[in-house]
Amino acid sequence: MEHFNPILGKETAGQKFITCGEIMLRLTPPNYEKLRMASNFEASYGGSEANIALALANLGVDSTFFSVVPNNSLGKSAVRWLRSNDVHCTPMILTEPNETPSNRLGTYYLETGYGIRPSKVIYDRKHSAITEYDFSQVDLDALLEGFDWLHLSGITPALAPNCRGLIIDMLKVAKKKGLTVSFDGNFRSTLWTWDEARDFCTECLPYVDVLLGIEPYHLWKDENDHSKGDWKDGVPLQPSYEQQDEIFQHFIERYPNLKCIARHVRYAHSGSENSLKAFMWYDGHTFESKLFTFNILDRVGGGDAFASGLIYAMLHNYRAMDMINFAVASSAIKHTIHGDANITDDVSSIRNLMNMNYDIKR
């Protein structure tokens, strides 16, 4: 397979990937219990950017994760978990109690849905170590040296002002150094407002090559008169090909730096059965994936698995239709894996699903 990607304009073989975000302790009541019923919790680790680094590392991509965690048993355990999945953690910052006003690991509680009952997430991540750290101490030029691909999301800047500054600075440095940049808006209503998210994420767009999702961004019909609305206003969550193609075209007209835009579409039949498909703009065309239907063991991290699948396929220069189908198949498989991350080192299992091959492998 050729590894020069003419759209990205670079050799993709052996590329080094880095991402930045908060890794959290995840606490889940067992056996689909509601939080109010729980007397014990299953503990694991997760977070959008960490999930993507871990998924790519399991598929053989050289992946590094940058974050700030407390220098205590919880922080060290999170780092060990990443390293056990082949994620490089050399740039990770472990803070001492006297280094930041707060020295704690962010936490979230997951109440896993079942049937008609949806899942529920409660965050406890205010004043975590990453939100209190002074990132002016970090030499971002040195941090990104030697890497080829940077992935960021709209979750980390929602945490605190210092994180917003970090993300913008990383985007600028990455652009200057010629890294491929992917960005997922990943709006979290419990972390900031819709308007805050739209303002910030739109500011990021000029630095992005690969855009995941079409929200939360401003795409005004008239920059001087916002009363005329956003091009995305009124577009359904489950758009037709024509509706999605039109939105992609408006993005490309406004931001010609974008080389790929992809978004997945979910059809929720119940809390335990969903279908997924995706649309992607790439090389001047809009592509629509197959529709995948599956039962859900753990929905958390499905979007991250979609992102990691797309990045993997781009790094391996898949054809466009294979690229988007591989991304959706990666997300579908994640829904069958317990925990935040798509922990599979078997590319063939994703490709088999992509090609709708369910035979038992003997």
Predicted segments with their positions:
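Glycine-rich phosphate/adenosyl-contacting loop at the front of the ribokinase-like
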Residues: 2-92, 113-116, 133-135, 290, ...
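Active-site metal-binding loops of divalent metal-dependent hydrolases
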Residues: 23, 185, 305
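Conserved N-terminal subdomain of the carbohydrate kinase-like
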Residues: 66-154, 181, 350-362
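Catalytic-core regions built around general acid/base machinery
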Residues: 166-178, 200-207
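A short helix->loop->beta-strand "cap" motif at the edges of active sites that frequently abuts
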Residues: 173-180, 255-259
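Conserved phosphate/ATP/ADP-binding segment of small-molecule kinases
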Residues: 191-283
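Conserved post-catalytic alpha-helical subdomain immediately downstream of the catalytic base
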Residues: 290-356, 360
